[in-house]
Design a protein with these regions (language model features):
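Structural/interface elements that position substrates and couple domains in central-metabolism enzymes
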Residues: 1-168
Length: 168
């Protein structure tokens, strides 16, 4: 069969869909989509209509952080404590400072509680959300964020991250 990239490109050719929202990411978030999908379900329930596809989308999105945390856990050989983990981007999507329902709000606290040493860089300079967490540091540059990391997570697809040279 076709690979995911080709499927995405094909679907994106349809102007009603477009390609902008067909890229893989940690989960959807923000102020609109989570609220809107829940409102659709609420309205459907009032009219006794089962929208199983929308319910599945919500459930799948809620599970994304757990799935990604499990992958991180496996990549680090089930040893998260004292591992240096960098998040590049913490907002729910690029080109915004919106943190609402960002999967980083679930992932970073969980990793911090497990003893990981978290560094993050976001082009917005965002730093308030994690300031009270142990072992979580906001960095002011990509280089400072990724230096000496055991694992780098590209969380948000900012253009700033497209040309990173990890060799330097």
């Amino acid at each position: 069969g076709l690979g995911d990239v080709y499927k995405r490109q094909g679907m994106g050719l349809d102007k009603r869909i477009g390609s902008r929202f067909l890229r893989a990411g940690p989960a959807y978030g923000g102020s609109c989509f989570p609220k809107d999908t829940k409102a659709i379900i609420s309205t459907a329930d009032k009219f006794k209509t089962n929208l199983s596809v929308v319910k599945s989308v919500i459930k799948s999105n809620e599970n994304r952080s757990k799935i990604l945390l499990d992958r991180i856990y496996q990549m680090l050989n089930k040893k998260v404590k004292n591992k240096k983990i960098t998040f590049l981007g913490v907002t729910f999507k690029a080109n915004t400072d919106d943190m609402r329902d960002s999967s980083s709000l679930k992932m970073i606290p969980w990793l911090s509680k497990k003893g990981a040493i978290i560094k993050y860089f976001d082009p917005t300079g965002y730093k308030n959300e994690f300031s009270k967490l142990k072992n979580v540091t906001n960095k002011t540059s990509i280089k400072d964020a990724v230096q000496n990391s055991d694992l780098v997570i590209l969380h948000t697809e900012w253009n700033d991250f497209k040309s990173i040279n990890f060799k330097n």
